[in-house]
Amino acid sequence: MIAKIIKGTNFSGVVSYMLSKREGQIKVLQANGVRSSLPNDIAHDFNLQASMHPSVQKPVCHTILSFSAHDLERLTDATMVKITNEYLHEMGYGDTQNLIVRHSDRQHPHLHICINRIGNNGKTISDHNEKYRSTKICRELTKRYGLTIGEGKQEVNRSRLRGEDKLRYEIFYTIKAVLPQSQTWKDFVTVFITIEQPKLIRNIRV
């Protein structure tokens, strides 16, 4: 289980994206403090609460929780909601509006959460060290629910990568292949440069 956190200013844009997939590819799992019907109504509900603290420039917290494809059969809607609510509670978002939508347009189970950083009490919810805290919480929840522990970059669908991201993962896989065969650091560097130098030259833009 991994989380990607994106801050923003526009609830309407996030909600529209979350609900814009084709029929059968999305499912609203939870609407806490907001309506669950039309995107404009949902965004209005979020904005109304955010207006309680207008000085906050980025009240939108769009979080994507992704799981290993190996856990697909185990991750029922109810289980994903339970895990997500535990994640939200431990991140400090237990007392604010949220919308949870499951997407099925990828091979791996994942869901999107739109969170209001302005709590139900009108106060801003702290995002201090949120990436560190999120990583730790995801690790704990993965163990707690006996989920598959992903192997970082190896869990990525490489066919979807472009540009710098594609090059970065090619380098990662080259290192993975070359390292076990290298007896010394010099051996590793020599083989690595031989393989990667042409790729780097092709991707450099002057």
Predicted regions and their residues:
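N-terminal nicking endonuclease/strand-transfer module with a His-rich metal-binding environment
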Residues: 1-206
